[in-house]
């Protein structure tokens, strides 16, 4: 699985 982290 690919986990994407979204910067804020």
From Swiss-Prot:
It comes from the Eukaryota. On the 2D-gel the determined pI of this protein is: 5.7, its MW is: 35.1 kDa. This is Putative LRR disease resistance protein/transmembrane receptor kinase PS4. It comes from Pinus strobus (Eastern white pine).
